[in-house]
UniProtKB/Swiss-Prot annotation:
GO molecular function terms attached to this record: rRNA binding; structural constituent of ribosome; tRNA binding
Assembly and interaction partners: Part of the 50S ribosomal subunit.
Family, per entry: Belongs to the universal ribosomal protein uL16 family.
Lineage top rank: taxon: Bacteria
Listed NCBIfam families: rplP_bact (TIGR01164)
Record keyword Iron present: no
Keywords, sorted A to Z: Ribonucleoprotein, Ribosomal protein, RNA-binding, rRNA-binding, tRNA-binding
Function: Binds 23S rRNA and is also seen to make contacts with the A and possibly P site tRNAs.
GO cellular component: cytosolic large ribosomal subunit
Gene designation per UniProt: rplP
Cytoplasm listed as a keyword: no
SUPFAM superfamilies: Ribosomal protein L16p/L10e
Name this protein carries in UniProt: Large ribosomal subunit protein uL16
Gene Ontology annotations of biological process type: translation
Organism: Thermotoga neapolitana (strain ATCC 49049 / DSM 4359 / NBRC 107923 / NS-E)
Length: 142
């Protein structure tokens, strides 16, 4: 599972997901990308499930880039515990995703396989996404 090696503070506040993604909105490494259309927290388990799903469709050919990283801890209090008594323990790690962010990129496979792999990965996520190509300007990839 993806998670930071060490963090300065063990627990974080929830924060809010206003607006669109500032960076990471273009396909920069692969030929096809999966773009988020809604804001959400994507867990480390969901990222791993997507990676395995894409590998299965691609039959280990090509290359996958994971453009998000779960660097935010989320906490949860035990079941049936009373309110108060401090913040709960860290339950897992999430990546904060805003609309427009590229989540995964794929290269080295044909268009049909890339679309199928990214669609399969999208089914593992709790948000709406779309498959986008790498932009080419004047014959050169951007």
């Amino acid at each position: 599972m993806l998670m930071p090696r060490r963090v300065k503070y063990r627990k974080q506040q929830r924060g809010r997901m206003k607006g669109k993604a500032k960076g990471g909105t273009l396909v920069q490494f692969g030929e096809w990308g999966l773009k988020a259309l809604e804001p959400a927290w994507i867990t480390a388990q969901q990222i791993e499930a997507c990676r395995i799903a894409m590998m299965r469709v691609m039959k280990r050919a090509g290359k996958i880039w994971i453009r998000i990283f779960p660097d935010k801890p989320y906490t949860k209090k035990p079941a049936e515990s009373r309110m108060g008594k401090g913040k709960g323990n860290v339950e897992g790690w999430v990546a904060v995703v805003k609309p427009g962010k590229i989540l995964f990129e794929i290269a080295g496979v044909d268009e049909e396989t890339a679309h199928e792999a990214l669609r399969y990965a999208a089914s593992k996520l709790p948000i709406a996404t779309k498959v986008v190509p790498r932009h080419h300007i004047g014959g050169e990839a951007v």
